[in-house]
Amino acid sequence: EEMKRAKRHQLERVITIFPWIATIDKFQHWVYENPSHTIEERKENWLRILNEFATSAIDYSGLESFRSYNWQRQLHLFEVPFYYIEYGIAQLGAIGMWKQYRDNPEKGLENYMKGLSLGGTKTLPDLYAAAGIDFDFSPEKISELMIFVKDELEKL
C-alpha cells in the first residue's frame, strides 16, 4: 500500500511540475529580454505568465501579495539561469522511455541500453533518437505523454 501511495505521488508530481517549469522558463526569458524593467513590470509580467500556466481550480484570495513574488522561491533563477527547463526535458525523455518499455519491454530495454552506451558523446536529440524516443516538445507530444501518465495513474 505504501508503494502504491509513493507511485501515485510521483505520477501526480510528474503531471503538475510541467506548468511550473514552463512558467519559470518563460518568466526568465522575459526578465533577460527586458533588462531595464521596473519592479512593477516584473510583478505584472510574472503574474501574467503565472496565470497563463496556472490552474483556476485553486482560490488564491488573500494571497495576491505572495503570488506576486512567488517566483523568488525558484532558486534556479538566481543560481543557474536557464537550467530549470532541463528537468522538463529529462522528465519527458524518461516518460517516453517508460512508455516505450510498456509498449514493448524488450525493444524499450534495448533502446535504453543503446542510449546509455552513447553517454555524452552525442547531442541530446541524437541520444533521444538512439533511445527510440522523439525529441519533440510540441503540445501534441506532451499531451500524448501526459495521457500515458494519467492512464498509468488510473491503474494504481
Label for each model-derived stretch:
Residues 29:
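Conserved binding/catalytic microenvironments
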Residues 11-15:
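A short helix-loop-helix "switch/interaction" segment in the helical subdomain of ASCE P-loop NTPases
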Residues 1, 21, 25, 33-156:
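C-terminal, non-catalytic "cap/extension" segments appended to globular domains
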Residues 1-10:
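Helical catalytic core of nucleic-acid polymerases
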